[in-house]
Amino acid sequence: MNVPEKYKEYDELLKTKLDDYRYIHSLGVAKSARHLAELYGADPEKAYFAGLLHDVMKNAAPEEQLQMIKKADIMLSPSERLNRKLWHAIAGAAFLKLELHITDEDIIGAVRWHTTGKANMTQLEKIVYLADFISEDRKYPDVDKVRELSEQSIESAMLYTQRYCISKLLADG
């Protein structure tokens, strides 16, 4: 996948911060986010950029993730504190702000909420959340259904993914 010239600096950064799988995944999320933004009337460039950087802290050690979160004066909720899998999104949003000096709160929010979602998500937050679910590298059992729904209705796709995640959490105990 070719990265547009204006994002080459960030592409190079990702190559130093992510393993090969996560790097390819990030390119796929960026591509899917751009497509969904075009489909649903959001800014395709912001969607691509947020998708590209959504996992920037994914391969960082938990201590490094926590350090970035603390540096940004972010207070973790009790459930966030207990679940390390959530830290990369929070740390990623902090990294965008503190290290990359990104000031667009829509992009920062899309990175912050791409793992859990939240009530009253912005269009860009929904797009990056879904793009993470449907990127080309994803192979989970319902991925084709989510891809199909994401082409028809962003709200239906969001509802389906939330239900899917809840049922998976319940099944996994």
Spell out what each predicted region is.
Residues 168-173:
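Charged phosphate-binding loop/patch that engages nucleotide di/tri-phosphates or the phosphate backbone
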